[in-house]
């Protein structure tokens, strides 16, 4: 009888222990999810490419229109809360220095490969201001150089003052861009730009150099379509941020015969979908696995 009671107690203890093991075992971590892709202004080429990506990859998320500032604010909030988020992104951009980010792989090459950034002018700028045209041909910088200006602008949005400071710190490089005859006499140069951080950096550096040379400079921010059409119609002089051959391909197709692609000022640019490095997938093709 004692033996029988002992066996019963033993079985009860084993059952309790089994329940305890199950109850105290590590709970399965919930899978993080992603919501809609956070985009920028609807006229941007990257937004058209992202609309195409939604179709090509049959994505079960949407695309939110906004602005560069709204996109980076959303990214900042998500990272502060260690949340997963997908944004439209491009490099060069100061956010890559601020946070640990990664481009999602694009196996269908919707966003294309590497791009370059070019300065584009009205056709007769070379006749009216040949030295300004030559300066734009010479203007070229690398990731560290444009990144330094973008970092300054992100910390304190005094764009012209930051450009002037950067110029003083990089005088040898800048002097190599300036042709011997670059000397204005109060003539007005009109520069257009889109409100992208890389465009702000290059536009104000070029503007500051031309002001040093004696020109009056007017900078106007517009959307990409207006920027291209205005230069094609001769309503302004130039802009420094044509992303080619992909992002601004449609504009080049439409206006290419009526503008002058003066020269490349940056190589190795990239566009695509960007996530914090801690996000647990690496490809656009995997987004649906984590869509909420």
Per-segment meaning from a language model:
Residues 25-27:
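Bacterial signal peptide processing site
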Residues 29-38, 122, 141, 257-292:
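A conserved helix-loop-strand patch within extracytoplasmic ligand-binding domains
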Residues 69, 92-142, 263-272:
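Periplasmic-binding protein-like
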Residues 63-74, 194-197, 218-230:
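Short helix-initiation/N-cap motifs at beta->coil->alpha
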Residues 20-23:
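C-terminal motif of bacterial Sec signal peptides marking the signal peptidase cleavage site
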Residues 52-53, 69-84, 204-212, 225-239:
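Short helices/loops that flank or line small-molecule/ion binding pockets
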Residues 30-39, 136, 185-198, 215-220, ...:
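Short, well-ordered beta-strand elements
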Residues 77-102, 240-255:
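A ligand-binding cleft/hinge motif common to bilobed small-molecule-binding domains
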């Amino acid at each position: 009888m004692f033996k029988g009671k002992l066996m019963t107690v033993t079985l009860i203890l084993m059952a309790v222990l089994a329940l305890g093991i199950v109850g105290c075992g590590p709970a399965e971590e919930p899978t993080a999810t992603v919501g809609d892709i956070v985009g920028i202004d609807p006229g941007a080429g990257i937004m058209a490419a992202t609309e195409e990506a939604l179709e090509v990859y049959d994505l079960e998320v949407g695309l939110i229109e906004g602005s560069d500032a709204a996109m980076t604010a959303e990214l900042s909030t998500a990272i502060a809360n260690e949340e997963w988020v997908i944004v439209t992104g491009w490099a060069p951009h100061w956010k890559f220095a601020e946070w640990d980010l990664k481009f999602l792989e694009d196996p269908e090459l919707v966003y294309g490969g590497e791009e370059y950034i070019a300065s584009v002018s009205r056709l007769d700028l070379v006749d009216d201001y040949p030295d300004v045209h030559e300066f734009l041909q010479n203007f070229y910088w690398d990731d560290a150089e444009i990144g330094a200006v973008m970092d300054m602008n992100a910390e304190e949005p005094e764009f012209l003052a930051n450009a002037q400071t950067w110029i003083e710190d990089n005088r040898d490089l800048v002097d190599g861009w300036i042709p011997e005859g670059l000397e204005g006499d109060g003539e007005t140069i009109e520069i257009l730009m889109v409100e992208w951080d890389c465009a702000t950096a290059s536009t104000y550096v070029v503007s500051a150099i031309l002001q040093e040379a004696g020109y009056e400079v007017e900078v106007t921010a517009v959307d990409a379509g207006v920027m291209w059409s205005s230069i094609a119609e001769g309503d302004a002089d130039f802009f420094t941020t044509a992303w080619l051959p992909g992002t601004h391909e449609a504009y080049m197709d439409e206006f290419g015969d009526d503008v002058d692609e003066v020269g490349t000022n940056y190589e190795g640019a990239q566009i695509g979908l960007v996530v914090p490095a801690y996000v647990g997938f690496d490809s656009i093709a995997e987004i649906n696995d984590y869509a909420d």
